[in-house]
Amino acid sequence: MKLLKYPRQLHDGQLLAGCVVGGLLVVVGRDRISAYDCGKLQAAARGELAVREVSAEVELQVEVGEDALRYVAGGEGELVVAGDRQIWAAGADWRSAGRGTRFLTVAQLAGGACVTDVKADGAGLVFVSVSGKDEVWLYATGAWERVGVVTLAAKPVTLVVDPLGELLTVVLQNRSVAVYQYNRQGAVRMHQQLPQYVQTNPLRYSITMSPQGDLLPLVNSIKNGLPSAQLLDRTAGFSVQSTLVGYVDKCKILRFSPRLYEKPNKDKPPTQYNLLASSGNEDGSVIVWNTKRTKPLLNAAKVTDTFINDVQWSRDGTGLFAISNDGYLFIFAFHEVELGRLLDDAELEKLRQSVPRLEPLPPPTPKSLAKSEAKPQQDTKPDAKSSANSVSAKTGKKKIAPTVITSTSMEFNEPSYTVPKDLKRRPKQETQTNGTTTKRPKRDVEPMDFLDTNLLIPNISFSKARLATPKVRMNFQYCNTLQQNLVMEVKNGTGSEQKPTSITLTLKDKEKDMVLFQDFTPRFVTICTCGHSFWACCTEEGIVYVYSNTGKKLLPPMIMGVPVSFLEGCGDYLLCVTSMGQLFCWNVKEGKLKFPVNTIYPLLNPSIRYSDDVLTRAENITMCTTTENGIPLVTLSNGDGYMFDPDMEIWLLINDSWWAYGSQYWDFTNTSHAGSSAAAGNDKEDKKNKYWNADAEYLIEEVKKNKKSVVNYLESKTNDEMTRKGLIRNLQRFAKTILMKEGFENLEDIVTLSHLENRLLVALKLNETNEFTKLLKVYCISLAEMGFKNRLDDVLSWLYNDGEYKVGTIANEKREELLKQILVACADIRQVQRVTTSYASALGLLDVSL
C-alpha cells in the first residue's frame, strides 16, 4: 500500500465532500468543483507518475452567493451539487464543456428549511433530504421534476441509497432509522422501521451499502454502552450480521468498496468478502475493514492533524481517497495481493440476483403527484421487542430503554401481568387419577416488588379482559377523513411541566398552512380522533380531552382511570374502549352517554376459553369504531363482526365467517371472491345460476355499488382475515366436498337464507333503509325460487299487517308499495303463485298483473 498526500491545498483549504463519477474523483468546497483522474492519482501514489503532472481534469465554478457547496452526487448522466439552501445540476456534458458548463437551479429553499444530504442512485433519481420540512424529495434527472416526497417524523440527517434501486434508508435526528421502498415513478412507502439507534453527534454521516445490496452499515450504534458499527443483513430482515467494535468512536464515514474480493484457501473454497473504509475520528485516522474479520485490515492512524470530511473508493476497488477538513487530498493505492483477488462484474451481478426482490409498488395516483407527496405506509410489522431492549450503563446496572417510539404507525404495549409478591394464591387441589394427563400451562401472573401496593391498580391486575394500549410516539398526525386538509399534530414532550406535549390543529392549504388552535398538556398523548364538529385525544393515563374546531373545550377532561385502547369519533359520537374492555359512547353535542357503560368482554368468547388458570388468550380486536348514529362496531381477527344494540343493550353478530363458506350472496363487494359460489372452479356458473333471477341480480349490483354500506365493509374485512390465515383454499374444498355429502344437499340454500336474514335485520338496526328494501326483495325472490312457501308467506303477512298495510312505513317506505314490489318480483315463479295470488287479490293487483 502506498500513501500520498497531494501537496497542493485545494479550494483555499475548504474541501467538504466528494464523489466518484466514472473514472473521475469530484471534490467540492466553497464555490468550486474540481475533478481528478483516479488512475493518475493512484499512479502518482505508486511512484509511476510525477506528482507535478497530476492536476485537475475539470475546474468549475458555481454562483452560490452567500451559500457554499457542501454536497455532491452524480452518475454517468448528471452532476448534482448543493449548499445549505440551493441545489444545482449539470447535464452529462459537464466534463467536455469545462468552465462553460451551465448549472440549472433545481431548488431554492427559504425560511428554516435546509439541505442535509444529497444522493444519486445512478439510474435517473436524485434524493434530497430537507430539514425544517422534514422531507426527502425525489427528482428525476433530465427534466429535474420532483416526482415524489417522503414525509418523515423528524429531521433527516443522512440518506443511504440501495445499489439495487429499491430501498432508501433515512437516518433521523431522533436517532431512529427508517427504510423506505421506492420506484422510478416516485411512489414511496415505509418498508421497515429498524430497531437500531444511532448517536446524533456527529450529525452528518457518509454511508453506503455493499455493492451486492445485502449489507447496510450503521455507524455509532449503541451496544453495551460502547459505540460500534453494525452490519445489517437485508436478506434476514435487517438483523445484525456482524459488529465492528473499536476504532469507530465518533465515526461518521462508512463506505463500501464498489468491488467484491476473494481470498483463496488451500483446503476450503475461496472466501468472498467486502471491504469498507471508516473515518471521521478526531485524530484523522482512516481504517479499512474486511467484513469477514473482526479486526481492521488497515489502520492509517493520524494521517492528518484535522479530521476527515469524506472518503471515496475508486471504481476498480484498488484506490481510496480521503478529504481532510484543511483542504488536502490523501491517496491510498493498494496492490491486488494486499486486498485479494477482484471479482468481475458478472460474479457481482450473480450475487445481486440472489437478493430477494420486493413486490413492485403501484404507480402513484394523479392526486398524489399533484401534491408531490408520498406518505409512508408500513408494510411490515416493526419489532415489538425493540422497545424492551436493555442498555448497560458504565456502572454495570441495566436500565430500560424509554418506551417513547418514533414510528408514525401505532404500536402497542402488552397488558400487565404483575401483582405484588405479598399476594397469596389459593393452592390448587390436585385430583388423583390413574392415568397421567398433560395439560399445557397457561401464562400465570408475575410477582414483583412494589414500594407500596397502593401503586398497583387492582382492577387492572385482576380484570377479566385486558387489552393492549398504544405506545407513546414522539410525534404523529391525524387527518380528518372527510376534510383531508384538517390535520391534528401531536408532539409529545417529556411528560412533565418542563417540556409539555403540544397539540395543534392545522388547516393545510396549497399556499399557506393556518393553525386553528394549539393546546399544551404535561402528559403523553397516545391517540387522536375527530367527529363532524369535534376533535378528541387521550393521554397515556386515560384522560380524554374534547375540543371544538376552534379549540374550545366542549367537555371537561374525562378520567377513565385506566389507559385507553381505542378512541374513535364519527358524527356527534365519541367511542372509547379502555384497557379493561369498558365501552363508553358519548353524544358530544348533548354531553351525555348514548347508553349505559358496557363491556366488550362477551365478544372474546369467555366461555370457550375459560380455564382454571388466571390468563387465557382471546382473538385480537382488529377494529373498534362507531357509526354516525352512535352504534359501536367491532371486528375480531377470526373474521367475525359485531355491533352493539343500544335498545337491547347487547352485542349482535353482524357477519359470521361461517357464512363465507356457504352463502351465495356473501361479500357483495367481491373484494376477494370468498363465497363458495365464487370458489367452486368450473361449477361456479352452475351454482350461481341455479336460482338466477334478473331482478335479484340487478338489486345485488345496486347493493354492490353502495360504498357506504357498513356490512359490505365488514364482510370485506372478514375476507381479509381469512386470506391472511390461508382459509380461502378451505372454501374451495368446501364447495367441492361437503355439498355432495348425504344430508347436506340443501346446506347452501339454508346458509344463504340465514345470511340474507341477518343482513336484513342488521340493516334495519343500522337504519340503512335503502339497502334494507333492496335486500328484502332479494330475500323474497330467493325464498320463492327455493320453494320456502311458509317463510315467504310469513314475510308477506308481516308486510300485510292484518289488512293495515296502508298504515305505517318500514325503512321509510310505505308497506303497500313494498308489498306490491315484492309481489310483482315473485309473480313469475310458479311454485309460490298460490301464496302471492292471495295477497295480490287483497291488494287489487290480480287483474292488473294478469
Swiss-Prot record:
Q: Where is the signal peptide?
A: none
Any one cellular-component term (Gene Ontology): HIR complex
Keyword Nucleus belongs to the record: yes
Q: Which organism is it from?
A: Eremothecium gossypii (strain ATCC 10895 / CBS 109.51 / FGSC 9923 / NRRL Y-1056) (Yeast)
WD repeat segments run 5-46, 61-98, 110-149, 151-190, 255-299, 303-342, 519-557, 558-596
Protein origin, superkingdom: Eukaryota
Compositional bias, Basic and acidic residues, is annotated for 370-384
BP-aspect Gene Ontology terms: chromatin remodeling; negative regulation of chromatin organization; negative regulation of transcription by RNA polymerase II; negative regulation of transcription by RNA polymerase III; nucleosome assembly; transcription elongation-coupled chromatin remodeling
Q: Which named protein is this?
A: Protein HIR2
Q: Which Pfam families match?
A: Hira
From the Swiss-Prot or TrEMBL record, state where the protein is found: Nucleus
Region entry Disordered: which residue ranges? 354-398, 411-444
Q: Which GO terms describe its molecular function?
A: DNA binding; nucleosome binding; transcription corepressor activity
User: What PROSITE patterns has UniProt attached to this entry?
Assistant: WD_REPEATS_1
What task does this protein carry out?
Required for replication-independent chromatin assembly and for the periodic repression of histone gene transcription during the cell cycle.
Q: Does the keyword Repeat apply?
A: yes
Q: Which family does it belong to?
A: Belongs to the WD repeat HIR1 family.
Query: Which keywords are on file for this protein?
Result: Chromatin regulator, Nucleus, Repeat, Repressor, Transcription, Transcription regulation, WD repeat
Q: Which InterPro entries match?
A: HIR1-like (IPR031120), HIRA-like_C (IPR011494), WD40/YVTN_repeat-like_dom_sf (IPR015943), WD40_repeat_dom_sf (IPR036322)
